[in-house]
């Protein structure tokens, strides 16, 4: 399936829907594609997130296939972006931004935290453009690659 066949037409509204258990195998496959070498999330991790009641959404392309997903954990007065992922052929059209904004709406007035690889230039640009600031660095955060992560927050 090519990106042209599945890409959302410009100006088309982005509709998000809840993540259901039957979506988990697709997300595991996307994790393996998007985060190779960095311990992509397993089915068990997604099951655990759903069982804990954390907020997860998916987006489907024009053919009905999941091309994006995002999750948020809310605890007391803070929220943490657990993951944001967009299939490679769906990147660059605002889907990641729409999902991040949705998570921030769910977070409400809470401080929102996240971790992001220091070499993930596109994600860093997205987070900065949405008002996130870098708080610090976590050395060798991602395993097994040993890649570093920035800790970011909104508002700081």
Residue locations for each model-derived region?
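Conserved acyl-CoA
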Residues: 98-112, 126-131
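A generic structural signal for beta-strand entry/edge sites
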Residues: 76-78, 111, 149
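Conserved functional loop/turn residues at catalytic and ligand-binding sites
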Residues: 83-85, 89-90, 94, 120, ...
């Amino acid at each position: 399936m090519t990106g042209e066949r599945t890409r959302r037409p410009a100006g088309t509204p982005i509709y998000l829907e809840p993540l259901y258990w039957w979506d988990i195998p697709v997300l595991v496959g996307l994790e393996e594609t998007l985060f190779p070498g960095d311990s992509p999330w397993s089915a068990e991790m997604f099951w655990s997130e759903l069982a804990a009641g954390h907020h997860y959404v998916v987006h489907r392309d024009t053919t009905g296939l999941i091309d994006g997903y995002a999750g948020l954990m809310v605890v007391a007065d803070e929220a943490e972006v657990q993951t944001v992922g967009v299939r490679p052929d769906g990147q660059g059209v605002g889907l990641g931004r729409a999902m991040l904004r949705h998570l921030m709406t769910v977070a409400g007035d809470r401080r929102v935290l996240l971790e992001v690889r220091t070499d993930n230039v596109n994600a860093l640009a997205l987070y900065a453009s949405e008002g996130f600031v870098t708080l610090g660095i976590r050395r060798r955060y991602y395993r097994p690659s040993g890649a570093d992560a920035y800790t970011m927050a909104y508002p700081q």
